[in-house]
Amino acid sequence: MASFIWVQLKKTSEVDLAKPLVKFIQQTYPSGGEEQAQYCRAAEELSKLRRSALGRPLDKHEGALETLLRYYDQICSIEPKFPFSENQICLTFTWKDAFDKGSLFGGSVKLALASLGYEKSCVLFNCAALASQIAAEQNLDNDEGLKTAAKQYQFASGAFLHIKDTVLSALSREPTVDISPDTVGTLSLIMLAQAQEVFFLKATRDKMKDAIIAKLANQAADYFGDAFKQCQYKDTLPKEVFPTLAAKQCIMQANAEYHQSILAKQQKKFGEEIARLQHAAELIKNVASRYDEYVNVKDFSDKINRALTAAKKDNDFIYHDRVPDLKDLDPIGKATLVKPTPVNVPVSQKFTDLFEKMVPVSVQQSLAVFSQRKADLVNRSIAQMREATTLANGVLASLNLPAAIEDVSGDTVPQSILTKSTSVVEQGGIQTVDQLIKELPELLQRNREILEESLRLLDEEEATDNDLRAKFKDRWQRTPSNDLYKPLRAEGAKFRAVLDKAVQADGQVKERYQSHRDTIALLCKPEPELNAAIPSANPAKTMQGSEVVSVLKSLLSNLDEIKKERESLENDLKSVNFDMTSKFLTALAQDGVINEEALSVTELDRIYGGLTSKVQESLKKQEGLLKNIQVSHQEFSKMKQSNNEANLREEVLKNLATAYDNFVELVANLKEGTKFYNELTEILVRFQNKCSDIVFARKTERDELLKDLQQSIAREPSAPSIPPPAYQSSPAAGHAAAPPTPAPRTMPPAKPQPPARPPPPVLPANRVPPASAAAAPAGVGTASAAPPQTPGSAPPPQAQGPPYPTYPGYPGYCQMPMPMGYNPYAYGQYNMPYPPVYHQSPGQAPYPGPQQPTYPFPQPPQQSYYPQQ
C-alpha cells in the first residue's frame, strides 16, 4: 500500500513579543496598578509561549500540537485587544517557504510582514502540517491508531481550507507559495482523501460488507483524483506527491472494483465479477509499472490475480456467463465519512486566555471617545461658570463695588481693597507672575525640540525608503513610508498647531500683564503706602445708614453665595467617576458592534443632567442679580456728592479691584499654561517613542527585505547563453553538437563535447612534428568512452605503440594530470613543468602537426569547482 503524504513545517525567525506589548500596556493602563503589572506578566508569558511553539523542533506527538494550538488561540484572542498595525504596535514576522529548499548561494524564499494575520496563517499552517505528521506516524493495525489518524487528517484538511479562505484578506501582499490559496486548497484535498482512506482501512479491518467497502474505496479514489488534478500543473509541492496521488487513485479504484466483484459473485453475476477483476488487475499493473518506486502493490496484485484466475476457471467450466464490457457495468456507489474539521477558536481544549480581563481595542477606543465626551461636557460647564464669575467681577470692578459702599470715610483704604492686597502678597505678587512668564519659553522650546526630533526620524526613514524604491522599483514590495506615516504626520501637525495656539495665548497673557503690572505692584505695597497712593475725598457719612447701601450689600452678599455654589458645583462635576466598560462589552457581545455615540450621550445625560441644570440656574440667578446691582448703584451714585476728588478716588479704587481680578486670572492662566506644557511633554515623548518604534521596525523590515533581494539577485543568471563555436556546427565534424546549457552565475560553464578526430594525414618518413606541438592532456578522474564516430570519420588502422612518445633521455615519461579541466583555448597561459613534444616512435604512425588547429583534441569531462546542486 502507498505511504501517506505529510507536510513539512514552516520555519520562522525569533520575535520579541513582550517588549512592544509591555510598552503599549504601560502607556495605556495606570502606572503602578495591579492591572498593568498583570498584563505585563501576561506579555512575557506570551513571548515564552511563542518560543516554545515555534522556536524549537517539535515531536510528532499530540502534546506538541497542543502547544501550537494554544499559541494560535492566544494570538487570535489578543488580535482585537491590541492595535496591531504598522503605525501602532509594529511586530514584523518572518517565515520561510515550507517547500522551498533554497540553493547553495541563496537561502529559501521567505516573507517578512508586520501583520498578525500573517502570523496566524503561518501558525495554523504548522498546526495542519504537524497534524499530518502525527497521522502519518500512527499504527493503523489497531483502532486507536486509525481513530487518531482520521481525526488528525480531517483537522489538517479543515485548517488548510481555513487558510485558503482567509489568507488573502489577512495579508497586504501576495503570500509565499506554500500558503497561497491554490497550494493550501490542494493540501486540504489530499488530507481529506487520506482521511477517507483511513476509514476504508478501518472498514476492511472490521470486515464490513463488501458493498460498503467498495463505496468507501470509490469515494477515496474520487478524492485522490481531485487532488491529483489540483497539483498536476504545480511544481511547488515535493516531487513524490504527484506520483503518490496517481498511484493511490488507481489503488483505491482497484479496491472498489475488487470488493464490488465479490458482491457480483454473491449475486451470481459471474461475468461482471470477471470484468471488474480484470479492470482491477489492469489498474494495479499500471501502478506496479509506473509507480513502484513509491508504492508496493505486490500482495494486492497477487490477491486480484488469484481471484481472477479462479473466476475465469469457474466461468469457463461451469457458468459460461458472458463477460460484459467495462462501460456496460453499473457505476459503483460512493459513501463519504469524512469532512474538513472547521477551525473554531479556541481550537485547543486546554486554552486559557492570558489577557482574559483586557477589553478589546474597539471597547478601548469607545472608552477613549467617551472620556473625551465627558471631559468636553465637564469643561464646558466649568468654563460657563468661570466666564460668568469673571463677568460679575468685571461689572463689580467697573462700579467700584464693594469698595464704594465701604469707603464712607473717604480717607482710609476700604476693607475689600486691603483683603485683595493681602491675597496678592500671599500669592507672591509680581515676582510669582514674572517667574511663571520666564519659564514658559523654556517649556515651549523643549516641546518643539521633541516634536521636531520625532518628525526628523520619520523624514530620514522615508527618504531612505524612497531611495530604495527608486533603485529596486517593483522589487521593493512593502508599504511606502509616505502612506504609512500619514496618521503620524497628521498627529504631528496637530501638535504643531497646538503649540502655535499656545504661543498666541502666551502672548495675550504677557500683554495683559504689562497693562496691569503697575497696579498689581501697588497692591503689593504695605497699607500706609497703599493708603497714600489712593486720593482722599470728603466724607460721606450721611450715606452710612441709607436704604440703597443696605440693598447693595444684600445683593452683593447674594452674588457671593452664587460664587460659592459654583465652586461646589465645579468640584461635583470633576469628582463624578463611573465606568462604561461593562456597557460597551455588553453592546459588543449582543450586536457585534458598539454604537458609542448613542450609549455615551444617554449615559452622560443620566449622570450629569442634574448638575448641568444647576449650572444653568446659577447663570440665570447671576444675570438677575447684576441687573438689580446696576440699578441700585445708579441710585447710590446720585446720592453721593459729586466732586473731582471723589471721582479720582473712585477711579483708583476701581483700578485696584480690576488689577486684583487680573492678577488672579493671570496666575491661574500661567499655572494652567505650565501644567499644559508639562502634560504636552509627556504626550510628545510618547509620540516620539511611537515614531522611534515604527522607524526601528521599518529598518528591521528593510534589512530583511534587502537580504532577500540580495539572495534573489544571486540566484539569477548573470548573462544569456553563449553561442557555440562555428566548428561545432561544421558538416566536417560528422554531427551537430548541442548548444551549451546556460550556467548559473557562479558556476563555470559546461564545455560541449568536441567532434571525433579525423584521420591523421600521412607525413613523409623524414618529417618530424615541431617540438612546440602540444600533446593531448591525460584524463582527470575515471576514464570515459570515446565520442561516437560516423563511418566516414573513422581513422585507418595504425601501428600500435606508446600513447605518448618520449624523449630518448626520459623513457616512459607521462605528463601529470592538469589541476583543472583542460581548456584548449587558453593553453598558453599555463606554464607546464615539462612541456612534452611529439616524437615519432618506431612502428608508430605520425601524429598530426600544428597545421590542423581546427580540430582540437578530445578533452576529458570537466569537473566543476563547486558542488553541483
UniProtKB/Swiss-Prot annotation:
Protein known as: Programmed cell death 6-interacting protein
Residues carrying Phosphothreonine: 479, 741
Region entry Self-association, spans: 503-869
Segments of skewed composition (Low complexity): 764-787
Entry's Gene Ontology cellular component terms: actomyosin; bicellular tight junction; centrosome; cytosol; extracellular exosome; Flemming body; melanosome; myelin sheath
Modified residues (Omega-N-methylarginine): 745
The encoding gene: Pdcd6ip
Tissue expression as described in the entry: Ubiquitously expressed. High expression in choroid plexus and low expression in cerebral cortex (at protein level).
Species of provenance: Mus musculus (Mouse)
Cross-referenced CDD domains: BRO1_Alix, V_Alix
